[in-house]
Amino acid sequence: ETVNTLKLRGSWGQLGNTSSNYNSFWDWYPFYQQQAISSASSNWLINGEKQNTSSLPSIVNATMTWETVETWDFGFDFGAFNNRLTGTFDWYSRTTKDMIGPAPILGSVLGTNAPKTNNCDMRTSGWELEIGWRDQINDFKYGVRFNLSDNRSKILTYPYDGEFSNQSIGGYYNGKYLNEIWGYESVGLASSKVEMDNWLTTNKPNWGSNWGAGDVMYKDLNGDGIVSSGANTLDDHGDLKRIGNATPRYRIGLNLDAAYKGFDFSIFFQGVLKRDWFF
């Protein structure tokens, strides 16, 4: 038989989640606060001695609760050629509701950081593929297994008081893919000071000085003659653009194994085919 096994799968599930960016006891139970006390830690002296100090705890958010994670998964398994060739494929969509995201910005008169809160939804979609071959030739057994996967996470909803276009490109906003990289576009390095001077007449950065040979020639994208970040908002980000994403894409793995008369050997490789890096 050419095809020995073919199985379709589908599943749905919903779980409470406490495994997020905030994993400590104090993050998940902010209503249990302690007033920190330190001995002889002050920066001032009274009668020639440092004084004991006490500090107030953070603001309490009594409404914070578990995140809700809902997952859909569809896939199939197959086996062929007497199950020497096997494989699986899965596509999934995981939605995290009431996720603990960055706290909303409050007025500086508050005097401290705003408490963490369940304020956004995020969806992670991806797929996983694995194909393997296992066979035997007389006393020699061998196997090969290859896997490939990919996923991306996107912010679905995030609260913002005001116009959507006024949100900062550095924070969460509706439709943002996690780990976006914003940066300036360049056309290369200046080969001479003359080339750089000519370039600066219509593409002058609003930072730095003494530009010359070997420096990066940044491109003015909005046509105002100045290379800048504008207001760093979705509506006015100057000459910044999405130049990449730091999320690892297309993770791969390769496993090889063999056995012959009591001796065995195995080796594996793993890596990432695409990832943007910034510094």
How should these model regions be labeled?
Residues 2-67, 86, 90-122, 159:
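Solvent-exposed loop/turn elements at secondary-structure boundaries
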Residues 143, 245-273:
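Conserved C-terminal beta-signal and adjacent last beta-strands/turns
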Residues 1, 10, 74-78, 89, ...:
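Residues on the lipid-exposed face of transmembrane beta-strands in outer-membrane beta-barrel proteins
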Residues 19-20, 182, 266-268, 275-277:
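Short helix/loop capping segments that flank catalytic or ligand/cofactor-binding pockets
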Residues 39-86, 115-137, 175-189, 245-250:
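Outer-membrane beta-barrel signature, preferentially recognizing the C-terminal barrel domain
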Residues 23-29, 117-120, 136-244, 277:
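Conserved small-residue
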Residues 83-87, 139-140, 262-267:
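Repeated loop/turn-to-beta-strand initiation elements of outer-membrane beta-barrel proteins
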Residues 12-16, 91-97, 133-135, 148-154, ...:
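Transmembrane beta-strands of outer-membrane beta-barrel pores
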